[in-house]
């Protein structure tokens, strides 16, 4: 048991094209239905693909036969495909923390089909809401001529993936109980004292 942590050094070009570029200037606005803010630059997409391959190359030697791999968010959509190409056979899950865009918006993305096809290398894909899962399913039905079963097994691109809705958030009752506890009150007082006369943002 335990957690193994590995760091990946990225070149400034990778940070600019992958993270600041494709992830946050292309996918993030597009997935939040802001086509007006979406930047389409070829170098961004190339950096996104290159950096995800790099992540897969670093992760692959660390994977044990019984490991389950869980990948999070739009920054790493192609990573399961890249791991599979390196011979990884483990179960791989993915959870998207953002909305999934309507098909009419997603098709504005150059190589949108390649991005969605890469998701079919996961074994399980999770969405926050039924609406976002439905938008994903609709894209696959129309753009990839895929089939969707009532239990959200989706077949397309010669592969199949199980999808589901898994809303996440904080334990509100537990959070409120902690706030109202003696320790919570002491913590609040300590934080308030340390913030005295300071601007908080």
Where do the language-model regions lie?
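Catalytic cores of carbohydrate-active enzymes across secretory and cytosolic contexts
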Residues: 1-201
């Amino acid at each position: 048991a335990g957690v193994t942590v590995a760091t990946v050094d990225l070149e400034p070009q990778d940070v600019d094209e992958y993270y600041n570029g494709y992830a946050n200037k292309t996918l993030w606005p597009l997935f939040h239905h802001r086509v007006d803010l979406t930047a389409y630059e070829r170098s961004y997409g190339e950096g996104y693909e290159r950096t995800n391959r790099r992540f897969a190359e670093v992760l692959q030697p660390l994977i044990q036969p019984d490991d389950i791999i869980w990948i999070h968010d739009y920054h790493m959509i192609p990573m399961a495909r890249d791991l599979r190409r390196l011979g990884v056979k483990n179960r791989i899950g993915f959870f998207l923390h953002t909305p999934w865009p309507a098909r009419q918006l997603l098709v504005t993305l150059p190589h949108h089909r390649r991005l969605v096809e890469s998701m079919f290398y996961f074994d399980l894909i999770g969405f926050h809401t039924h609406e976002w899962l439905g938008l994903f399913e609709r894209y696959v039905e129309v753009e990839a001529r895929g089939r969707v079963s009532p239990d959200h097994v989706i077949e397309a691109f010669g592969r199949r993936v199980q999808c589901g809705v898994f809303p996440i958030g904080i334990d509100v009752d537990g959070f409120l109980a902690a706030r109202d506890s003696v320790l919570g009150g002491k913590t609040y007082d300590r934080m308030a004292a340390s913030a005295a006369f300071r601007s908080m943002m």
